A protein has these predicted regions:
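Aromatic-lined carbohydrate-binding/catalytic grooves of carbohydrate-active enzymes
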Residues: 1-118, 132
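Active-site and adjacent substrate-binding regions of carbohydrate-active enzymes
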Residues: 29, 44, 57-61, 112-195, ...
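Glycan-recognition surfaces
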Residues: 76-115, 159-233
């Protein structure tokens, strides 16, 4: 896709009363498929010609809000960030890491890792009138080892990792109080009260079949309010 294709979609959406255009995966780094660029959170201006602010402003002129997809917790082996900091990925010392979905998981128990990724997110959100962020997390945690923790404290990593995610999202909603943050994890794998503290809605499921969604949302509604269930057209 490119800027003109996105604006064409936005024009059609505006005619049908849709209120927000969300730009999904593929807008950053050098990403043309799922094998590259997670961690390189800068705009690919070969696709987003004219820059992100121009695109967002043009979408806003059509009466639509603008949203964006990110997967801040992940890193691609084929990324500038991984080439600079291969030790930032979660891994057991002296073992080859497990690659899943062509990506590794960043060690968000480490402050320097959180700060680096957060600064990149902050720069993107500060550059344009972005109303919504879909924070995705698409793979399981494996190879649970941290190069920063001593051997007798490796068991703390999973807990410290989640606390790191919480800290980043706390900063996000503090710095951008009008932002709508939606959590997602391969669908609804993170639909829990901890994440709802930071995001008022969570992506309910990657199954968007209208009939199948009825059962999914009925079951989710036994515990959670309907307003918390995210769904896209």
């Amino acid at each position: 896709f490119d800027t003109e294709k996105l604006l064409d979609i936005a024009r059609t959406a505006a005619k049908h009363g849709i209120e927000m255009l969300v730009m999904d995966d593929g807008w950053f780094g050098h990403r043309n498929d799922d094998s590259t660029s997670l961690g390189d959170w800068f705009v690919n201006e070969e696709k987003i010609t004219g820059g992100l602010k121009y695109l967002v402003d043009e979408v806003n002129k059509l009466g639509l809000k603008f949203g964006i997809w990110m997967e801040p917790e992940m890193i691609s082996p084929d990324s500038e960030l991984y080439k600079e900091h291969p030790d930032w990925a979660i891994a057991v010392k002296d073992r080859v890491g497990t690659l899943s979905r062509n990506q590794y998981v960043l060690d968000l128990s480490r402050k320097e890792v959180r700060d680096c990724i957060y600064d990149k997110i902050h720069a993107i959100l500060s550059s344009a009138n972005i109303a919504y962020v879909k924070w995705d997390m698409n793979r399981q945690l494996t190879d649970m080892g941290s190069l920063m923790l001593p051997a007798d404290r490796q068991g703390e990593l999973a807990h410290r990792y989640v606390l790191g995610v919480y800290e980043m999202q706390e900063r996000l909603i503090h710095d951008f109080p009008d932002l709508l943050l939606e959590n997602c994890s391969g669908g609804g794998a993170r639909f829990d009260p901890g994440m709802l503290y930071y995001s008022p809605q969570i992506w309910c499921s990657d199954d968007t079949d209208a009939i199948e969604r009825l059962g999914i949302q009925e079951g989710t509604a036994l515990i959670y309010p309907l307003s918390a269930m995210g769904a896209h057209v």
